[in-house]
Amino acid sequence: LILATMTKPWETVFCTPMAHINCDECNAPEFYMGGAKLTLVEARAAKMTPESLRKALDNEGNRGVHGPQRGPVSITTVTERGTIYSLEEIRAISAVTKEYGLKLHLDGARFANAMVALGATPAEMSWKAGVDAVSFGGTKNGCMGVEASVIFDPTLAWEFELRRKRAAHLFSKHRFLAAQMDAYLEGGLWTDLARAANAATGLLVAGLQGRNDIRFAFEPQANIIFFEAPRALHQRLLGAGAVYYVEDGDVTAGDPAGILTGRLVCDWSMTPEAIDQFLSLLAG
C-alpha cells in the first residue's frame, strides 16, 4: 500500500530480484499499484548498489509513452539474505534516487535488527538518510499481526489512509492488535528484542564457524544465517528434529555430498540452551 501511494499505474518500481515485493507477495504490489510493474536491479548479497541502480534507471523511462515511467526505488534491510545496508549505502542509494527525482521506500520488516546491528538511530536509518517511507516491521520482532507504515510526507500519509480503507485493511476492533505497537516502542522494548535475536545469532554463528563441512553463503549481519552444507548433513540434522528451511534442491533425495543451502533464523526468544542443542546435533 505504501508503494501504491507512491507509484502511478504507468510507472515501475525498482527493486532487487530477491526483494519480498518481487518474490513473496503473490503480485500484490502490482495489484494495489493499479498495474504498475517492477524493474529488477542487479544486486550483490541482496543489495543494490548506486551503480546498478543508475544502470537500471537509465534503461527505463527513456521510451516516452511506449514504456513504463520511472517510479520509486525500494530497498530492504535486513535483506532477504541476512545482509544489511550500511548508513553510507542507504545515503548513496538515496542520492541516486533523488538525482532522478524519485522516492525511496525502505522495506523494514527487520528494521530493528538492522538498526541495532549498525548502532544507529531510527532517524539515521530513515529520513536522515533520504528515505521517504518505511514499512516498519513488528511481526518479525515479537508482535502478533502488527506492522506500521511510516510516511514522512503528510500528503502521501493521508492518501495512504484512504488506500488502507479501500483495501479492507482498516477493520473493526483492530485497535486491540494495533495497541501492541505502543508497548513495542515504549521503553526501548523493540530494540531489546532485536538485540536479543542478533546476540543469539552471533552465538550460533560462532558455533558454526570453523567446520570444514559448512560455509556461509552470505555474511550473517543480523539474525538470519544462510549456510551451505552437504545433503547428508542436512538429512541428519532434520532427521534428529532440527527445523529449518533448505533451499536450492530436494533434501530427501540426491547425492549425499551435494551442497544445499539452509536458512536459520533466531528470534527474540531464542535461548543459549536451544542453540547448544542444535550445535550438539551438528556435532553428532
Regions from the PLM with identified roles:
Residues 244:
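FAD-binding core/adjacent interface of flavoenzyme oxidoreductases
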